[in-house]
Amino acid sequence: MKSALRFAAALLLSTGLAAPAFSTEYPLPAPDSRLIGENQLTTVPDDKQSLEVIAAKYQIGLLGMLEANPGTDPWLPKAGTQLVVPQQMLLPDTPREGIVVNLAELRLYYYPKGEEKVIVYPIGIGQLGAATPVMVTSISQKIPNPTWTPTPNIRKRYAKEGVTLPAVVPAGPENPMGLFAMRLARGSGNYLIHGTNANFGIGMRVSSGCIRLRPQDIEALFNSVPKGTRVQVINQPVKYAIEPDGKRYIEVHQPLSHNDKDDPQTMPIALSAALKTFIKSPQSDSELIKAALARRSGMPVLVSSGEAVEAQKPEEAQQSAQVSAQGQATVETP
């Protein structure tokens, strides 16, 4: 219990809660820094809004909101409930170039060439049995008003549900690829970054392998990203950083499940040799790290050894330290 209370206090201190802001654009930190953004607080206004509506307002994915607010009803969160909006994050450990997709955190990072900024978008990715692969590739084609040609496997899966798909779904409002698509050069070009015609599925595992964005996000990205842009897709459920001031942070997301029986809240997370060294360092608080690995809040947690942690009310600490399993959706769309 003591380590849980210390972890909860550290989480609230390190998240930098501030007044609401809605931009997904962040100034690029120095090369030796990876911490960006500030978390926000928002209050559920009534009993008529789903968590997806609130998440979309702040440009957050649904599972990201659930990680940050365990136990919240995703369909009808209770009016007056105070929610943390997870807008603080650590940049992935990759080159700051082009597009970087981190599957585990269900986010896409875009580094515009020659600009000192990074733009972050929530995404939907491949479901169980149709996972989005890890890769390094590039944008090979930009397609406005795309048609959708379902693969034979996709048509078979739909047929099992009693849905007969046409060979080609024409462009328009009924097309699940939305109004914009960018084809990836990998393999035969079956993977795309595209929009959606649905009002759900962002920040979830719902696609047939493609990377999906909300309509306004894919339009902005489509209009900004040139053909040939580098795209790196990674799977890093744990990110960590030592900032220029010496402070140490760890950000833990629920890992991607491998089957229907996996619980992303409790399934093991593989730790790299470098991460193990980070954890064992005398400059790191191993108890705070252990709590962060269990909590999997999806937010950076300050884990420096010897950091002063202010006291908070026991009920606040208990709520912040609560661990709750959140499943991953398997709705099937492109």
Where are these regions (language model features)?
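Bacterial N-terminal signal peptides
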Residues: 8-18
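N-terminal targeting pre-sequences for secretion and organelle import
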Residues: 222-265
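Primarily a LysM-type cell-wall glycan-binding module
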Residues: 26-59
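LysM (lysin motif) carbohydrate-binding repeats in extracellular/periplasmic proteins that recognize
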Residues: 46-76, 117-119
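Sec/Tat signal peptide C-region and signal peptidase I cleavage site
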Residues: 19-25
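Loop/turn positions that initiate beta-strands
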Residues: 78-83, 228-231
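Gly/Pro-biased beta-strand-loop elements
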Residues: 89-197, 223, 252-333
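Bacterial N-terminal signal peptides that target proteins for export
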Residues: 1-8
